[in-house]
Regions:
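Beta1/beta-strand and adjacent pyrophosphate-binding region of the FAD-binding site
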Residues: 1-12, 34
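Short, well-ordered alpha-helices that flank and scaffold nucleotide-derived cofactor binding pockets
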Residues: 18, 22-26, 160, 164, ...
Length: 322
């Protein structure tokens, strides 16, 4: 019997398994952690998270946690016992000024970030161009802020690092293992039935994500899940125009994030609306719906309709001269 069974081998599930197993080692417990994944670990990592790690946030608590996360990713050996290369290119945030040529919301945000020792500083157009080259289109009507601590993670490197950390910590990994049924006695989950047999555990962690409601509804647990569809596009670019060492561009004028991949690819995705109305609408449709789950962050441009790809192209043309 395992101390803990983590169901779901995405980034969060894998990180949970690694941390739990290391904690058990630290307190001299000989018990084991098992990580179950229906396909292979972090299969959607390249498209789903875009590898952007930044901390500036309107919510102070979120900023503090994100800043800690940045520190952990930068020195992963202290946390997981393995090293990982990160790309520290920083991030440039862009937003419209008001009629007076100011952006009081971001000015106030910059001051609040100072109080938690996070640099989110206003820069001028010339500094922006210096950091990005003349490929970026700037305007006097916009405000530019620089977050030097923001970093990028290459998803393929992250995936390899997760496998190394799981091996290093001694987690039992079961890939291509699909959970059919969660088994319980009274109100306690005791085991799960899979295509590779029954797996027993004292504790179970739900890291299934969008499919949680489907899996756990069989034992009467209602887990509300709603997902806002987000699609991404990737363009091949010339290294003479957009270099790999390009800052993350958080473009709130055109509502789009840009980052450069290795091999001179330009990645773009639009931020989620995080609208209370939109989320409520999804919940009204189905309290436990996987609404949009099958479309979430498709990595291939071919999966998007032409008008959506064209939308990204139009946005990119407003920000980049090439």
């Amino acid at each position: 019997m395992y101390h803990t069974v983590v169901i779901g081998g995405g980034c969060l599930g894998a990180a949970t398994a690694i941390s739990l197993q290391k904690k058990l080692h630290k307190i001299n417990k000989k018990e084991k952690v098992c990580l179950i994944e229906k396909s292979v670990l972090c299969a959607a990592e390249s498209s789903r998270h875009s590898g952007i790690v930044r901390a500036a946030n309107a919510d102070n608590d979120a900023s503090i946690m994100a800043s800690l996360s940045t520190d952990y990713w930068s020195d992963l050996r202290k946390v997981w016992g393995v090293e990982m290369e990160t790309e520290k290119f920083g991030a440039i945030w862009i937003a419209k000024n008001n009629q007076d040529g100011e952006n009081p919301v971001w000015e106030e945000l910059s001051e609040r970030m100072k109080k938690i020792n996070l640099v989110f500083e206003k820069i001028d157009k010339n500094s922006t161009i210096e950091k990005c080259s003349d490929t970026i289109i700037t305007s006097d009507s916009e405000a530019y802020y620089y977050e030097p601590a923001a970093l990028q993670i290459d998803p393929s490197i992250l995936r390899s690092t997760i496998y190394d950390a799981l091996d290093d910590s001694g987690v039992d990994v079961m890939e291509k293992t699909e959970v059919d049924i969660i088994l319980s006695e009274t109100s306690t989950i005791t085991s799960c039935s899979t295509n590779n047999g029954i797996i027993k555990g004292k504790n179970f962690v739900n890291a299934v994500g969008a499919w949680s409601s489907h899996l756990f509804s069989k034992i009467g647990l209602k887990i509300p899940v709603t997902i806002e569809p987000v699609s991404v596009v990737n363009w091949m670019e010339s290294p003479k125009q957009i270099k790999h060492e390009y800052p993350i561009i958080a473009d709130y004028t055109n509502l789009c994030y840009f980052r450069s991949w290795r091999g001179n690819k330009l990645h773009a995705h639009q931020p989620r609306k995080r609208s209370v109305y939109e989320i409520a609408k999804n919940f009204i449709n189905d309290l436990c719906a996987m609404n949009g789950g099958e479309y979430l962050n498709e990595p291939m441009n071919q999966s998007l309709p032409y008008n959506q790809i064209k939308n990204y192209e139009d946005i990119a043309s407003k920000r980049f001269s090439n």
